[in-house]
């Protein structure tokens, strides 16, 4: 009986969803990315998105401040962690988006994160003047939040107070050469470890990966459903360099952008398996419960 209780305590929603998702092999994903996405063509397209850590609170929290086009990359409210992660993801592959955040220069063509004329009018009417990088980053989050809330369940919208569901985040996520799909993660299983290995393979290939985090179903359903979104960053970016790569030298690791505090953390891949305690890189949640894995765009 004790073993049953223990299993229930660490059950996560991904355990219930994982039979619905196809298996993932990290080696297969790495080969497909290397062959079909051609990461080398992305070289030089990754913008300068991180500055060296300087704030005392960032050092105390063990992270490095993340910046995008001069804006501190912090989610604008309690429901926009997914929006901030998706803007950061898009900026990693789009220098024109970074330039707009930095100085307001309009991209040559429309971007899903940049408000159109009507959107700018609405922002001004609500008191948000796009006068500096921080406000433009906030505005981009608002635009993305609106997009991910539309048509979430057929034609029905998603309540904005409930954040960003994984399937609309996968629909909205954009990075050159790939699209994204939802892969549930149970970090106590070989299948979950394979998904996390696939995340590592993607970041090694230069592709960022959004991660959904949460707690244990044993503490109640509200702790097990996806509660927060972070972003595994491409290895070799300035975010990665500024972090110092401090986790277990030589061991596979991820550099994770955590939007609630706007910090990046380096985490050993092994430390994401069979977790029982909160982790700052996961927004102080204990588990990765889903990943938006990249696949070569059709």
Predicted regions, residues:
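Active-site nucleophile-adjacent alpha helix/oxyanion-hole segment immediately C-terminal to the catalytic cysteine
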Residues: 4-153
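Short, well-ordered alpha-helical segments in soluble proteins
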Residues: 89, 93, 176-177, 203, ...
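Cysteine-dependent hydrolase recognition
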Residues: 151, 155-158, 298
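Cysteine-dependent deubiquitinase/ubiquitin-like isopeptidase catalytic cores across multiple families
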Residues: 159, 167-202
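Active-site signature of cysteine proteases
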Residues: 189, 193-197, 201-204, 212-298
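Short coil/turn segments at beta-strand junctions that form active-site/ligand-binding loops
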Residues: 207
């Amino acid at each position: 009986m004790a073993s049953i209780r223990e299993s229930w305590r660490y059950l996560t929603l991904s355990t219930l969803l994982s039979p619905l998702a196809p298996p993932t092999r990290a080696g297969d994903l790495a080969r497909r990315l290397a062959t079909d996405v051609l990461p080398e063509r992305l070289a030089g397209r990754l913008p300068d998105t991180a500055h060296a850590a300087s704030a005392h609170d960032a050092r105390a929290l063990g992270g490095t401040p993340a910046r995008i086009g001069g804006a501190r990359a912090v989610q604008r409210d309690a429901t926009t962690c997914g929006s901030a992660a998706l803007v950061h993801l898009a900026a990693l592959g789009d220098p024109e988006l970074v330039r707009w955040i930095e100085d307001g220069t309009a991209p040559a063509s429309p971007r899903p994160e940049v408000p159109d004329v009507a959107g700018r009018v609405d922002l001004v009417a609500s008191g948000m003047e796009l006068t500096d990088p921080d406000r433009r980053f906030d505005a981009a989050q608002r635009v993305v939040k609106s997009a991910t809330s539309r048509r979430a369940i057929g034609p029905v919208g998603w309540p904005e107070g409930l954040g960003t569901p994984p399937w609309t985040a996968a629909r909205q996520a954009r990075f050159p050469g790939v699209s994204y799909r939802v892969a549930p993660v149970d970090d106590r299983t070989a299948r979950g470890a394979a998904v996390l290995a696939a995340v590592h393979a993607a970041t090694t290939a230069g592709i960022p990966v959004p991660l959904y985090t949460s707690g244990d179903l044993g503490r109640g359903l509200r702790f097990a459903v996806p509660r927060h979104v972070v972003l595994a960053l491409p290895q070799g970016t300035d975010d990665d360099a500024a972090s110092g790569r401090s986790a277990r030298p030589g061991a596979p690791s991820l550099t994770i952008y955590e939007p609630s505090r706007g910090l990046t953390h380096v985490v050993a891949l092994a430390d994401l398996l069979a977790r029982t305690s909160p982790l700052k890189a996961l927004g102080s949640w204990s588990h990765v419960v889903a990943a938006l894995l990249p696949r070569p765009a059709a």
